[in-house]
C-alpha cells in the first residue's frame, strides 16, 4: 500500500501555493480535487504534469462535488451537472490518473412524491459517466458517503441494490472506500468484507462517529489497527489517501507506523 494525500486540506489556498506545498510533503500519491480554486483547466493540468512528472508520484482526481447532483430530477440542472463532470473527465484523462472519484446522486425535496425517479436518474447518469470514461480509458469510482446527508448510496444494502441494477456496467465501476464516512454509518468492517473486490481506492480521515469532521488519522474514534488489518486481508494494493482537513503530518506518520 502507498500513502497519499488529498488536496482537500489546502482547497482554500491558491492552486500554485497548494502545489508547491504538496511537492514538499513526501507522499507517493496525490489526489487532485477538481473544485473551487483548484478546478482543472489546461494551465493547471500542465502545471501538475511539470511538478509531478518523473517523481514516481501517482495521481487520482476527485470530481467536482459542490452543487453537483447526478440524480437531479430537473433535466436542465442534470445536463449542466453532466457537462461539468464530463469536462472534469477530459482534463483528468490528460493526467493519466489511477482513478476518478465521483459522488452518488442526492435525494431532492420531491423524492417522496416521485418514487424511485431519482434512483433511476442516478443509474442513468452512472451509465452515462461510464460510457464517457471509456472514451478516455479512464477508471472511475463511486464513493460511499455519510449520514445524515440525503445521498442515495451510503450503506452496504444500497450499494448492493445499485450494483445489481447496473448489471454488466457494474463490472467497470470501482469503489472509493471512505473509512471516515463508513464509520459514521457504522459499517467499516461490513463494507470492506462485502465489497473488498470492488475497492480500488481508499480515503482515510477520522471522526467520532457523529459528524463528518475529516479529522487527522488517530484524532477520532476509529480503530485504525483494525482498519489496516481488514484492508490487508482483501489484498488491497492501492493508495491510502489522507483526506483530513488538518494534522496532515501526524496522519501520515501514524499510517506509516501501522503499515510497517
PLM feature segments, named:
Residues 29, 60, 141-142, 176-179, ...:
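Generic enzyme active-site microenvironment
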Residues 54, 75-174:
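Active-site acidic/histidine proton-transfer and metal-coordination neighborhood
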Residues 28-29, 58, 98, 139, ...:
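Residue-level detector of anion-binding/catalytic polar loops
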Residues 14, 40, 44, 80-84, ...:
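Soluble or luminal CAZymes and related metallo-dependent hydrolases
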Residues 43-56, 125-132, 191-194, 226-230:
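Catalytic-core regions built around general acid/base machinery
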Residues 1-89, 93, 259-260:
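N-terminal pre-domain/capping segments
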Residues 9-11, 34-36, 65-67, 104-108, ...:
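Active-site-proximal loop/turn and secondary-structure-junction residues that shape catalytic pockets
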Residues 1-2, 11-12, 16-23, 98, ...:
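Histidine-acidic metal/acid-base catalytic patches
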Amino acid at each position: 500500500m502507498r500513502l497519499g494525500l488529498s488536496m482537500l486540506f489546502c482547497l482554500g489556498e491558491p492552486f500554485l501555493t497548494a502545489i508547491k506545498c504538496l511537492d514538499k510533503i513526501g507522499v507517493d500519491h496525490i489526489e487532485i480535487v477538481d473544485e473551487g480554486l483548484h478546478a482543472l483547466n489546461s494551465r493547471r493540468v500542465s502545471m501538475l504534469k511539470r511538478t509531478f512528472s518523473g517523481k514516481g508520484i501517482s495521481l487520482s482526481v476527485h470530481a467536482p462535488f459542490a452543487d453537483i447532483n447526478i440524480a437531479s430530477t430537473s433535466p436542465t440542472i442534470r445536463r449542466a451537472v453532466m457537462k461539468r463532470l464530463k469536462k472534469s473527465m477530459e482534463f483528468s484523462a490528460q493526467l493519466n490518473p489511477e482513478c476518478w472519484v465521483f459522488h452518488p446522486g442526492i435525494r431532492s425535496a420531491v423524492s417522496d412524491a416521485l418514487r424511485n425517479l431519482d434512483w433511476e436518474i442516478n443509474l442513468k447518469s452512472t451509465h452515462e459517466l461510464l460510457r464517457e470514461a471509456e472514451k478516455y480509458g479512464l477508471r472511475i469510482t463511486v464513493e460511499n458517503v455519510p449520514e445524515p446527508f440525503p445521498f442515495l448510496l451510503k450503506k452496504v444494502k444500497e450499494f448492493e441494490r445499485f450494483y445489481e441494477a447496473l448489471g454488466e456496467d457494474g463490472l467497470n465501476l470501482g469503489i472509493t472506500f471512505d473509512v471516515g464516512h463508513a464509520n459514521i454509518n457504522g459499517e467499516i468492517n461490513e463494507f470492506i468484507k462485502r465489497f473488498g473486490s470492488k475497492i480500488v481506492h481508499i480515503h482515510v480521515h477520522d471522526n467520532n462517529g457523529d459528524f463528518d469532521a475529516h479529522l487527522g488519522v488517530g484524532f477520532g474514534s476509529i480503530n485504525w489497527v483494525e482498519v489496516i488489518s481488514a484492508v490487508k486481508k482483501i489484498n488491497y494494493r492501492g493508495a491510502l489517501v489522507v483526506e483530513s482537513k488538518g494534522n496532515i503530518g501526524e496522519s501520515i506518520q501514524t499510517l506509516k507506523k501501522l503499515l510497517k
